[in-house]
Amino acid sequence: AMSEETVTRLRRTLAHVGKARLKDVPGLSSGRIPTLADAAALLAAMLKHLRSSGTIVSAYGLREGLLYERLSPAQRAADPLIVAARDEGRRSGRFPEHGDLLDRWIAPLFGDDRRADARLRIAACHLADVGWRANPDFRAERGMEIALHGNWVAIDARGRAMLAQALWPALGGAIDSPAPLAILAGEASLRRATQWGLAI
């Protein structure tokens, strides 16, 4: 999410940064650079006109929004992270549909999980077997890579770190957090995710 102030600051910055310098920004498509400043100005104007206090930026675009409009109410109500984790578990795991069973089994241990964290735990259960095709010495790394770099939606950096931390011990890694995770999530969050992973 970006506040109105952040969008205004982005617009001002892009108005003064040369296109040559923008080409050095990692992950920024060179095809978008010529229109980036105009897009930021348009976004700022839209926020002002709509009197919106902020915006949420989607990694997906207009096409996906049009597709979303065609979904049934039940499909729209589904949690996109859980749906994606379930699909990945079906594709990459040995035992399709085990994620829901696994979560029902361990959920009583974590009755105090906040709703936002419970959905991360459910996603971790769906991904619990994604590393089985990897060499046993690298299954934990495979799980962590999928959690951190998977094409997930409706999840932030903390959530990705918690998913990775849950899969790390579940797939044979040590209890300690691998290097990048402590930057993305706090100690209490990673400790809870470790507990999920050990239960898994």
Language model features with spans:
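Helical "lid/coupling" subdomains associated with nucleotide-phosphate turnover
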Residues: 1-200
